[in-house]
């Protein structure tokens, strides 16, 4: 149940408001097990969604062992720049990063080594990016498994051996 609640919260946080005449919701997502890249959809009501770019990817992943672009999280900075982080591999200690002024043309992709100080870290999954206006600080939260560090609480057969905990920078 806790996993479902966390998933729902992270999904809602992934939706952001963009103003360009009318207010719309923008949703970033992945398809085909995330090797395809960044996909975007919009909605006026949060219920009916339309894929942008004909459903094609806006950005193909180039960083990480597996070159994935899973769980993309986009945040708009006060200067209008969009910053994005994503899961870049199944078993890497990095997350991907890129920025854009228009959500179409993206900067060179970079690997952020968020768990390099933890040699036993198994992964860095589902990063979420936030900007706190009061402190003018960006925060990135993600889930990582460090075998033997925390009690294992598998919620399904596929979760065996994983003990994800939330970390942030």
Roles of regions detected by a PLM:
Residues 1-4:
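Positively charged n-region of N-terminal signal peptides that target proteins for export
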Residues 6-15:
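Bacterial N-terminal signal peptides
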Residues 18-169:
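Carbohydrate-active catalytic/glycan-binding domains of CAZyme proteins
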